[in-house]
C-alpha cells in the first residue's frame, strides 16, 4: 500500500473554478435542440436516413426500368428527399462537432461525453495520469466539500453506479481517469452503505500506478507509520531496516537487537537455496498411469528436455528440479526454479504451463485439475516448505559478547539459553508448532514485507523460523542463529514499484533488478529480513528473560486516548483548515 506523509490539500485544489462559459458552449451537441436524449435522436435520424435512402433508390430503379424521368417526383418522394437531407445535415453536424471537439479539447475535457459515448478512446488515458493528475472534483475531494453540489457529469455516473447500471469495476476504463474513478466509486459506496469513510484518505496517491497490477476497485489508501531500526551490521555492511507497523515497541526492540549485534562485531548470513515452486495436480484413469508420469518426471535423463520447455517462459526462469507425490490416481508435481530478482510466482506458473502442454502429447489421458495443487505450498504453513524450502532459504548468525549481553540486553547468557530451550523449542513442540520454533519472527517479517512492497500473505511461510541459542567461549558469550527455509521476496514486480515501497527498497540498496548478477538483490533482501529477525529475536528473548516485556508494552504499546473525542477533534480541525 502506498504510504504518503501529506494527505490534505489546500482548498483551492479541492474547489476548482467552474468551467468558463465559452468552454461550456463548445460542448453543445447537435441533438441538444431536441427534447430527446442524444442516443435516441441519433437512432431516429440514422433510421430516417437509411429508410429515405432505401426508398429513393428503389423508386429510381423503377423509373429507370420504366423510362420515367427522374425529376418527376410525387409527394412521397419529396418527403423522402426532405428526410434524407435533414438526417444527413444532422448526422454531419453531430459527428463533425464531436470530431472537432476531440481535437481541440484538452485531456481533462475527454470525460465530458462518458455517459453518451461509452468507453471509446479512453483505454490509453490512464497511462497519462502519472504525468499530470486532474484536480479532484467537488464533493469527492474532501469531507468539507461533501454538502456541495457535484458536477453534473459525476452526479449522473454516481447515480448510475448506485442503481447498478454502470459497473463499479469499469469506471477506470470508461473515464480514463483513475483518480476520478476512485472518487466516484467512493461516493457511490457512501450512498449505498450510508457510512462515511472520510478518515480514509483519497488524495495524495497515484491511482494509475496500481491499475491492472496491485489493487482493483480502489476508494482510498491506508496510512501506516514506517519506522527505521538499525544500523544492522550484516556481512560487513550496514543496513537500516524500514518497518511498517502499528505495534508499539517492535521497532524499538529490533533497534536494540541491532545495537547488540553491531557492538559484538556484526552478523553473517548464508543463502542455502533459491527456488520458487509451483505444484500442479493431474488426475489419471489409474494410479499406474500416474506412476508412469512420476517416473518420467523424476528420471534424470529427461531433465534437460523438461528444462528447455520450462525455461521458455522467461530469460530468468531456470528449472532446478521436479518433486512428485501421489494420492491415489492423482499426481502432484512440485516444480522448482530460480526466478531472478522477482518473487517469481507468475514466472514459475508460466513455465509449469509450458511443461503441462508438452506432456499432454504423450499422456493424452492426463486431466489437469489445477495449476496449483497445494503441494507448492503457497500462503499456508506446510511441512514441505519447512523441510524442502521455498523462495530463499537463509541462515543468519552472530556471537554476542558477554559484556553486550549484560549492558545492552540487561540479562545473562545462561538465562537466554535456558529460556530459548524451554520456550522456543520445548514450548513450540508442546503446541505442535509447524515452523514456529521462534519468539516472534512474523513480527519483523511482516513489518519489512509491508514497507518494501512484498506480499504480506506470504508472511505465513516466510516466517517459518527456528531460533537457536548456545553458550560459546567457555560459556561467556552467546551464539544465536535463525534458520528460515522459505523467505519469499522480490525486488521487482507487484507492490515493489509503488513510490513509497520503492523508496524503502532503495534505502536498503536493493531496488529493482541487478543487471550484473540477476537475483542478487532479492537474495540480499532475504538476508536482510533474516538479519532483522535475528535482532528481533535477540531483543525479545532478552526482555522476557529480564522480565521487562509487560512493563515496556504497558509504557509504549498501550493506548490511553479517548478515540471518539480524538476523532471528533481531528474532524473539527480539518474543517477549520478547509474553511
Curated annotation (Swiss-Prot):
UniProt keywords, alphabetically: Endoplasmic reticulum, Glycoprotein, Isoprene biosynthesis, Membrane, NADP, Oxidoreductase, Transmembrane, Transmembrane helix
Residue span of region Linker: 101-153
EC class (word): oxidoreductase
One CC-aspect GO term: endoplasmic reticulum membrane
Biased composition (Basic and acidic residues): 570-579
InterPro entries: HMG_CoA_Rdtase, HMG_CoA_Rdtase_cat_sf, HMG_CoA_Rdtase_CS, HMG_CoA_Rdtase_eu_arc, HMG_CoA_Rdtase_N, HMG_CoA_Rdtase_NAD(P)-bd_sf, HMG_CoA_Rdtase_sub-bd_dom_sf
EC numbers for this chain: 1.1.1.34
PANTHER family: 3-HYDROXY-3-METHYLGLUTARYL-COENZYME A REDUCTASE
Official protein name in the record: 3-hydroxy-3-methylglutaryl-coenzyme A reductase
Organism this protein belongs to: Zea mays (Maize)
